[in-house]
Amino acid sequence: MLIGYTMLLRLNTKLAVKQFILASVGLIACAFIPLLLGKFPQVRGWRNFFAIAGILFLITTLIPGLKMTMYGSSNWISIAGISIQPMEFVKILFIFFAASSLVKVNEFKELVINACIAIAFMLILILENDFGAVFLFYITYIMMVYLATSRPIFAIGGIAMMVLAIFVGYILCKHSLFAHIIVRVRAWKDPFAYQQTDGYQVSESLFGIGTGGFIGSGLGRGMPYLIPVAESDFIFSAICEEMGVAFGLELILIYVSSFIAMANVAMKCKDPFYKYVTFGISVTYIMQVFLNIGGATKFIPSTGVTLPLVSYGVSSVFSTLIMFAIVQYTYTLVSKEVDDFEDEKYRIIQKARRQRAREFAGNAPGNAGPSRERTQNQ
């Protein structure tokens, strides 16, 4: 977060101060999330609630008077002058829905029904032109299903279906629903050919990274403000320009290590519900990093997904803090499981030692002889 604040102060002081204040409030609020999860263990059975709440929250972006269109996507709403991106919070509800449904899956029919509900989330996101979120939700769900079933066929089949859906959708709707995506793909394929139009964002992003080089031009000495949406979608390019590609690689390593730590917590958790939740959070987290940095470096088309805890965006920061708080709760469960295991292990060892001590005392030569003699004399 400090990296994000530093860059935001460089780009836009007003936005940096706003994000700092709201993120501080979010940190305090998120401190209570592990306590709330501990008080409500029945959340694992709220599958229908998570599904309905998530879908209804997404639908608010389609309501005239509430919805806002920014950067080609209608995935924002405005309440009392405050811009909110429902997708950032719905992704948490989606993960909880997926986890609660996978815990109860006993038949293939149930898996199909749950998959249809998951697709409903994604269809609404398609109507909002938020294809980055669609990809994020889809990969997260496929990976959670794979973890729950341990069947690679579901993961392979899911990815194949995604590719097929993209191809068919492109053919059928390339001049309407997918027009926004076509612009981004064209800018991705050859940004310098459309440098003054569709490829302006990507070309300036690449110029910024190239200008900074390996060690950067120095904080305050570059021109990251020339990069469009540098405070959000392309903040990684701004960081590389002034702090260097080396610093950018270090930032990527921080994200990867965080992902590994969260995935490790998930794998150690014996509670299947929170195991799936934490794993889903870890996948969502690292996929956001991939989509943002991949778009900024022209590895993939730009998706508009924010860089967790670095990009400007109150909704993004709040949702990421909430996810970290949930992982923290899972970590407490794992710690408790380890403590219980160690206590049980210690109890068993002590019991075995006492048993061996009694056997040794009963079989000792000095004890057996005299006791028999006293018995005979009596």
What does each of the following model-derived ranges do?
Residues F96, L102, G210-G218, P308, ...:
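P-loop potassium selectivity filter motif centered on the GYG triad
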Residues D130-F135, I215-L219, A230-S232, I300-T303, ...:
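Transmembrane helix boundary and interhelical junction motifs in multipass membrane proteins
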Residues F137, G220-L226, I254-Y255, T297-T306, ...:
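Re-entrant/interfacial helical elements at transmembrane boundaries that shape
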Residues I209-A246, A266:
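Long extracytoplasmic/lumenal interhelical loops at the membrane interface
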